[in-house]
């Protein structure tokens, strides 16, 4: 009769010991690093920036590093000098025109990574525009004969030029017609699929369908139209869009900035895949965060 009592007492003592020591065990947190990165931007708005920052902060948190955000100053040289004086580990640029700051930072020696653009001689992280061009054209040719497909280029957009360059061979093989975008461009008759190679032209074409200035039976394939992308897809204003992954771009940019600061990275271009989003796949788990970034 005593044996069950002894076992019960032992179980109680074990439970007390687990409560005292087991639940007080603390998981080691990453050691705080002195590395400090600055994301330099033109403005502090938009879902793209929000997701980019999440990617940066996630990559930094793994090694206990810090990321702050600053807006571009009117005095670029003074701002670059301040980065150097305050021992910033690296600067990550998300700027419409990064050239002046790149020049200023080169004079201070502060490592720099460019996001969203490909600039020779620098570490850059952007979407895979060459792949995006191929994906758009492949979808277009699956929807209509080459004679019904019109490619709309945009020479003012560097990323558009990369997309068009990637499809030159297919353009020639299929004798596809290209049209340079302008604010007063005229879309000739006889085409059912419009392939827009820039965000600007895609946005205007979608607005044209919405307003009735363009026929509603056009199939428009293009580049991410921004925070209205879900409405554009749901409303049939566009048939499919290639979309950047800003979270992945931010994560990769931070990793490359760390390597660059340690002297372990040559200048090069690093790209993130740009999935093709349409009404059939926009609600898949892997695409929801790209289509509805504000919900994340």
Predicted regions: what is each one?
Residues 126, 149-158:
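Short beta-strand->loop
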Residues 60-77, 150-151, 168-185, 193:
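Short beta-strand elements in bilobed, periplasmic/extracellular small-molecule ligand-binding domains
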Residues 2-7, 18-131:
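Alpha-helical recognition/docking segments in bacterial nutrient-uptake
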Residues 24, 248, 252-296:
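Hinge/cleft segment of the Venus flytrap/periplasmic-binding protein
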Residues 48-63, 132-136, 158-178, 204, ...:
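Short, solvent-exposed amphipathic alpha-helices that sit
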Residues 124-148, 227-229, 244-262:
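Hydrophobic alpha-helical segments within soluble ligand-binding/sensing domains
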Residues 91-108, 179-230:
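Hydrophobic alpha-helical
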Residues 115-116, 223, 244:
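Generic beta-sheet signal
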């Amino acid at each position: 009769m005593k044996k069950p009592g002894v076992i019960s007492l032992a179980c109680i003592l074990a439970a007390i010991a687990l409560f005292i020591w087991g639940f007080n065990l603390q998981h080691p947190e990453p050691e705080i690093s002195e590395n400090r990165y600055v994301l330099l931007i033109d403005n502090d708005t938009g879902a793209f920036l929000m997701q980019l920052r999440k990617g940066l902060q996630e990559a930094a948190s793994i090694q206990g590093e810090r990321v702050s955000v600053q807006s571009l100053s009117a005095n670029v040289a003074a701002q670059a000098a301040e980065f150097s004086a305050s021992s910033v580990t690296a600067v990550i640029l998300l700027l419409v025109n990064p050239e002046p700051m790149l020049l200023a930072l080169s004079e201070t020696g502060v490592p720099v990574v460019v996001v969203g653009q490909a600039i020779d001689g620098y570490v850059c992280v952007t979407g895979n525009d060459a792949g995006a061009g191929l994906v758009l054209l492949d979808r277009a040719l699956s929807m209509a004969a080459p004679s019904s497909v019109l490619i709309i280029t945009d020479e003012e957009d560097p990323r558009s030029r990369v997309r068009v360059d990637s499809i030159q061979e297919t353009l020639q093989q299929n004798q596809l017609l290209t049209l340079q975008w302008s604010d007063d461009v005229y879309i000739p008759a006889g085409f059912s699929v419009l392939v827009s190679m820039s965000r600007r032209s895609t946005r205007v074409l979608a607005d044209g369908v919405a307003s009735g200035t363009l026929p509603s039976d056009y199939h428009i394939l293009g580049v991410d139209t921004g925070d209205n992308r879900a409405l554009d897809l749901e409303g049939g204003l566009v048939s499919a869009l290639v979309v950047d992954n800003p979270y992945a771009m931010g994560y990769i940019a931070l990793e490359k900035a760390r390597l660059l600061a340690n002297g372990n990275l040559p200048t090069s271009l690093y790209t993130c895949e740009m999935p093709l989003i349409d009404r059939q796949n926009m609600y898949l788990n892997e695409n929801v965060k790209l289509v509805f970034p504000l919900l994340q």
